[in-house]
Amino acid sequence: EAVQACLDWVLMPANEIIGIEPVRERAITAEKLAINAVMAGCLPAHFPVVVAAMMAMLKDEFLLHGTTASTGGCAILVILNGSIRKEIGARSDFNVLGSSDRATSVIGRAIRLALINILQVSPGAIDRSTLGHPGKISYCIAEDEEGSDWSSLAESRDIPKDASAVTVLAACAPRQIMNEWTSKPEEILDTYAAEMRANMRNYSIWSGNYVVVMAPQHREHMRVAGWGRKEIANYLFEKARVKRSEWATVGKGSVIRDKGDTEYCALPSPDHLLLVAAGGPAGGFGAIIPPWLGTKSQAVTAAIGVCLDCEPPPLTK
């Protein structure tokens, strides 16, 4: 009954194909996905998010097989936007990166269970992660749209303002930062940029979709100074850069060779930054969430429950 309730909520028959995993050509049906959602603890109202997230993950540019089979240890991060956040009780304030509510906890868990049970992405089988990280259990957050002067992440990625949406990303574990000693946007963002550079030296030098999670205290300093998404992204694009010679400082000098002066940027362009407003009200905290091995996998944003680029049905006489 619980599985059927999920299917009824999204108006899908059990045998409807959600998508096909492109490498191994495995079909994911609505029923199989609903079964895993129910096992994860999802209510019917959560299921549209699970469906949209899975559809986004099956896009070629996401490279689902690569992200789930890699030794690199990434997990699937799901970011929620739009009215559905309030409808399902997804919180975006306290403990936002720590499974702060039922909705985000079970949605993230449903994605992981579906990968394991439908696509056999279990440790030691398809999943070859050397270490992994706790986000493999559940990795889902909601953006604090009401507490931010910015347009939402989804809007910045061409989703209409009145549509709910998910953004999926093959993501490493969060790297928390703190800067409570300045109100200047440049100095605050220097702390974020330093953490991005540290990831480039210690994990992967390749550019990709970095997530910046910015809590209210830092956002307020940005607002007072007149800094929005564009200014923040442009600044980090310029500051989050390393030279290959810097690898010598972290024990990787043998791979520098004659490329020591080659400069690498964390972001292919400012538009590749995924800036998310979220977090509790107190404290000068934020987080960097690095991508899995650069641009091999790209973040995908999709509307929930609607098709924005579908062809209209043919007119009938």
What are these regions (language model features)?
Residues 1-317:
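Non-transmembrane, aqueous-exposed alpha-helical and coiled segments at domain scale
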